[in-house]
Amino acid sequence: MEDKTQINIDRLIDLGSFEVTGAEKRQFEGELADFLEYARVINGAPLHLPPASHAVDKEQLLRADEAAPWKEREALIGNAPALQGTSYLVPPLAGSSGTGKEQEPRTVKPGSGDYEAVIGLEVHAQLNTSTKLFCPCPTSFGSDPNSNTCPVCSGQPGALPVLNREAVSMAIKAGLAMGCTINERSLFARKNYFYPDLPKGYQISQFEEPICSGGFVEIELDKTKRKIRLNRIHMEEDAGKLVHVGAPGIWGSKASAVDYNRSSVPLIEIVSEPDISNPAEAREFMVMLRAILVTLGICNGNMEEGNLRCDANVSLRERGDTELGVKVEIKNMNSLKAIERALAYEITRLEQMKRAGTPIEQETRLWDDSSQKTALMRSKEESHDYRYFPDPDLLPLHVTGEWIESVRAALPPMPLERKNRYEREFSFNESEARLFMVNPGYAAFFEKCLEHYGNARNLANWLFSELLSHEDDFDRLHVTPEDFAKFLMKIDSGEISGRQGKDILRRAFADKVALHEILGREDHAQITDRASIEKAVDTVIAAHPGQVAEYRSGKTRVLGYLVGAVMKATGGKANPGLVNEVLTEKLKG
């Protein structure tokens, strides 16, 4: 069998069009032989060059080695092996074939080993205002395309913006809740770039003078609390939305349409410092940030509808180093799971490039949920690329101390405060209290129920075990807290059984009928009359002689089956405790 590790040195030199002397050639032959032997042992796979017809331009290869992504460099040299020490090839993963083809990043804890990840997040939160940031158009989601537009938000010449005071108050509220300094003077600027969904050719944002500076979001992971610092919170208008025809994204689509309904919808952008060190912390940051914004009532927090959007900047550096590495931006992460997976993938990809000696370039990449990979979108812009300058149509924004204090006075308790209170007052365990902390809708429903029903423990049990099994989005919940409280009181009083209660809830959600309607139109009174239950028990015993014989022979577990049969015979209305008592007596008799 031909030993494919024996490479014709003349052909190798000819491939690269290198000029070497005889002595250099002999030295090169010796070094290459040693290297090939090492590579054969390490890779466990034969080594071979591409066919002779595969011409490689030396200058092109050198340019690729300096600038191009590693996959492009690989394409220049064909099916060459992935060897340690070459700056233009991907190092092989454990168990790889050594072909140099792009492979799935290893499943490792991101940031482990010699490198550590440095992550910063930029989060856009859509504010719950009724009108847009600079015009009176409504902000309602789901309207017909381009129905919520006017000359201002569609960028018509001569149309002038007027700032929405409600949006400013919401930005102040967010800043206060996160410990920011509220700047009494802030300035709107034009961020200039071209894109089809940007009708004016620029976006009105804030740059040098944001409305909020500093601040933090406190996270708790593995029972350890950390404060993730914020750089700033600033206000800006949203862009329109591209709708792609024939494909979920722009790639492969037949055409793209623009919907300007979202244009100029008010946003705040929360920019963190690069304090996040792994994907789990990034996810927890987003969980806590969403909980804060929803608790404040300033954002719906729905990532699927685009109410909350997150971009991540990630870089790697050697562990213990203080200098930041070249950052890569990741976009198109529309869920908490996507944020965690995208960061894990990208950190591993960057680690592979570091180990291969491949230069990392500043770029923007898109997360693809279907392939679970990131893909190059464009080279990352710097702030000067946007040519920021103060918007001449808007005066500087001045926020008075009185305005700030009036907003502060209306702040509700924050999620962590709520968690601590629930653990203290209701003796909830950590996981139960956390569910209320990260889901403000659950907490609001719970608090309303407590106004009518005082058993917090039983309320939480029914809330988590039954109500949430039917609907976990309390914005869509058609069961009111008042109805749910009365429903639980009927169970506590024995008017209806727990089994009946579960069936009533199931029908309420299946038929989308209010609880009080079902309770009012049907007889749900629990059967507690002993004579009626004895009659039902006698019928069941007569109908199930086999199970009765099993019970009397010592197989007492069959009692549960017989209790269920009695409950079925009475339409779930019989008192379960009394059924159990009567059955036991009659089976022993």
Each predicted region: which residue ranges?
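Basic, nucleic-acid-interacting segments
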Residues: T99-P413, R424, E451
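C-terminal non-catalytic interaction appendages of large macromolecular assemblies
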Residues: Y260-V265, M303-C310, R319-T322, A525-G589
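The catalytic Nudix box helix
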Residues: I9-G22
